[in-house]
């Protein structure tokens, strides 16, 4: 009989914010701090919010203006309790604020330092390696790991909870950062224990929360849990579709999966809604997850496409946005060359700014389709199009020309642009591209000698371009991404130079 598996998921608490607090010799649990680049205006997304600041009703990934608004509301409430309704000072420490109602709530806005967070993450990973072999650890993100603890419990003569606590305490001692953990009989259950159950239990003196689930306790505790979006891999789209068919909980989905064929709710309904993905949804509804750590680490995804996206820090007009598209295309092609890939299909998506409809001077110029964004605001429908090339290539010239033609064809020149996404589809290894024999109808009027000469010249151009691309890549790898810049990268509004100094779209 196979040994019962035991998995542990560990999530570092408000990781970016905790790092910034420790670097200021402050307590991450009591310091009001938000990680955000306020130079991008108050509309910028916050990367992390400290636990004490979240206590004022601030979500984990708000816009900076939401933080400002929530703190302002909290201060208005506190002012009524202060003597003479006047603050005597301010503090960004929750302990001081709780002890003295006459203090105004303050907070620190820390600019992101992605490279530094990666260093911290590496340091924490080395702590896990003191207890667990690398083949039994799967880094899920910069601040979260899965651990297969099955073969370590007897070795250390510990329970899963004791092992998890030992590692978390070591991380706390080494870095000053605390964590939340989930323990389960499969990878799904340990993730759910961490994400949902642990959030509803009291932390210990160090802020540590640890929760456990097996298949039966999962069903008892979470079959009636709402909303569905709290569960791993259930997004708003899935939840909306399920609720439209009367399925509001994991228990509803589980019951639906065992319905008879002549009943309204049965397995076929789920497969009709979600196709093959219904199999995973049904497994998760029952608390099953057949995928093991070994299978996860052995999985190698096929590279069929690469995508590059950018949200502009302010609305760009037609020409300035075109410059950004050109920069992004140029960088994407270099990435293809670096990976030895070629493509024959490019997809461009342009998202317009809300100012197109909120500004009276622009609103009446637009007569096209209007959609509602995720914040409930009206915005012109995005532009979307595809460019197909005659052959697979990684030529900057050919791909850029195709994308520029596509941009001119699909984008409304009167609208302001806010989001740009470029995708290269149908990627294959350039070494695997076989030259297929080409057949053509001969005639007496074509100068085939001139045609062959033209083809030879084109091949020579492509070869020269390829040597230049490889030289640029070599220099950039040795001296940094900004070691070689093009003239367009220095034009007003260009973003490539700044983005080369970022990690994940944020300051390095």
Task: List each language-model region with its residue ranges.
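C-terminal hydrophobic structural anchor segments
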Residues: 405, 409-474
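DNA-contacting surface of Y-family translesion DNA polymerases
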Residues: 9, 230, 236-417, 437-439
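Gly/Gly-Pro- and Ser/Thr-rich, intrinsically disordered tail segments characteristic of DNA damage-repair
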Residues: 1-293, 444, 449-508
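Short aromatic/hydrophobic contact patches that present stacked aromatics
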Residues: 146, 388, 421
């Amino acid at each position: 009989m196979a040994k019962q598996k035991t998995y542990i998921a560990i999530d570092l608490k408000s990781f970016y914010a905790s790092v910034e607090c420790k670097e200021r010799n402050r307590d991450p649990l009591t310091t009001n701090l938000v990680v955000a680049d306020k130079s991008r205006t108050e509309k910028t997304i916050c990367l992390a919010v400290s636990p004490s600041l979240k206590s004022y009703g601030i979500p984990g990934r708000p816009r900076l203006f939401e933080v400002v608004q929530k703190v302002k509301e909290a201060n208005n409430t506190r002012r009524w309790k202060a003597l003479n309704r006047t603050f005597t000072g301010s503090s960004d420490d929750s302990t001081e604020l709780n002890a003295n109602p006459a203090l105004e709530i303050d907070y620190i806005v820390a600019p992101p330092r992605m490279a530094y967070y990666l260093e911290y993450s590496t340091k924490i990973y080395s702590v896990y390696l003191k207890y667990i072999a690398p083949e039994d650890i799967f880094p899920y993100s910069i601040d979260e790991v899965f651990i297969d603890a099955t073969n370590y419990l007897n070795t250390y003569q510990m329970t899963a909870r004791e092992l998890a606590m030992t590692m978390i305490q070591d991380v706390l001692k080494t870095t000053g950062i605390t964590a939340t953990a989930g323990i389960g009989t499969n990878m799904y259950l340990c993730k759910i224990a961490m994400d949902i159950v642990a959030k509803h239990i009291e932390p210990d003196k160090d802020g540590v929360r640890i929760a456990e689930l097996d298949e039966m306790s999962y069903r008892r505790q979470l079959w009636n849990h709402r909303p569905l979006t709290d569960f791993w891999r259930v997004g708003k789209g899935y939840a909306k579709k399920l609720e439209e068919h009367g399925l509001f909980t994991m228990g509803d989905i589980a019951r639906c999966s065992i319905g008879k064929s002549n009943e309204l709710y049965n397995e076929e309904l789920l497969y009709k809604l979600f196709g093959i993905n219904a199999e995973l949804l049904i497994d998760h509804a029952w608390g099953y997850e057949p995928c093991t750590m070994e299978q996860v680490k052995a999985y190698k995804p096929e590279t069929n496409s690469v995508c590059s996206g950018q949200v502009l820090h302010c609305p760009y007009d037609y020409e300035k946005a075109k410059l950004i598209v050109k920069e992004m295309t140029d960088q994407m092609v270099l990435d293809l060359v670096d990976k030895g890939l070629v493509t024959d299909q490019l997809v461009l998506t342009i998202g317009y700014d809300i100012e197109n409809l909120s500004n009276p001077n622009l609103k009446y110029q637009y007569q096209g389709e209007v959609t509602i964004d995720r914040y409930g605001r009206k915005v012109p429908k995005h532009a979307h199009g595809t460019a197909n090339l005659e052959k697979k290539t990684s030529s900057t010239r050919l791909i850029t020309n195709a994308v520029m033609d596509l941009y001119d064809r699909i984008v409304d020149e009167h609208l302001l642009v806010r989001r740009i996404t470029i995708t290269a589809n149908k990627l294959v290894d350039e070494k695997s591209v076989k030259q297929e024999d080409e057949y053509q109808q001969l005639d007496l009027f074509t100068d085939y000698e001139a045609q062959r000469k033209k083809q030879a010249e084109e091949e020579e151009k492509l070869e020269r371009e390829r040597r230049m691309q490889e030289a640029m890549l070599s220099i950039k790898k040795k001296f940094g991404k900004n070691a070689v810049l093009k003239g367009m990268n220095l034009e007003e509004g260009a973003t490539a130079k700044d983005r080369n100094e970022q990690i994940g779209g944020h300051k390095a």
